[in-house]
Amino acid sequence: VVTEKASDKKTFPYATETLQILSNKKDLRLRFLSASPEQMRRVLQKKIQMDEISFDEVFLKDTTSMVMSGTIRGVLNQVSYKLPVLLQSFLQCIENFSEQEFYHLLFGDDSEDDPIIYTIFESIVQKKISYNSPIFERILESCSIPENAILAIQEMSKKIQQREYKTH
């Protein structure tokens, strides 16, 4: 809810401590991806500041643009929002750190969609499923992802899978 205060936001046990440790590592880029609407940015930044965590980037869903453009389904669909952001972020990593081995760690608070999103993401990154596989397209369709988002996901997946990189 947009009227929430930073102090009202609940934190999962040990999440703050874990993120504080990670945010203090100099060789680590920490990104915060949330399906919360852009209107929550100030509240979330205040909560992040209260928890003494430092993120390199914060991604929030632009629900206003979605509503104004008539893509109401996109407001509710977390996969079509989060998966492209993760893929684009990963592409930036392999472009910036192509000669280095790097690690990525994903954890979330959406017990329904995050496991699906992370499984699809990991399958792409680890090249377990091909970007042009009919199965891959069926998986994306089964997540109710709009056609234009499926094409964008396939294109980013292609770019990722054509690159050489070491990741864990």
Spans of model-derived segments:
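Alpha-helical substrate-recognition element adjacent to the catalytic core
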Residues: 1-74, 147-168
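Alpha-helical scaffold elements adjacent to nucleotide-binding pockets in ATP/GTP-utilizing enzyme cores
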Residues: 18, 43-47, 85, 113, ...
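Short, surface-exposed basic-aromatic patches at helix termini and helix-loop junctions that form
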Residues: 24, 45-54, 91-98, 119-128
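Hydrophobic alpha-helical scaffolding
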Residues: 34, 76-79, 108
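Von Willebrand factor
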Residues: 71-95, 118
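Conserved Lys-Pro-Asp/Glu-containing loop-to-beta segment of HAD-superfamily phosphomonoesterases
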Residues: 86, 92-111, 115
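Acidic, Mg2+-coordinating phosphoryl-transfer loop and its flanking beta/alpha structural elements
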Residues: 111-168
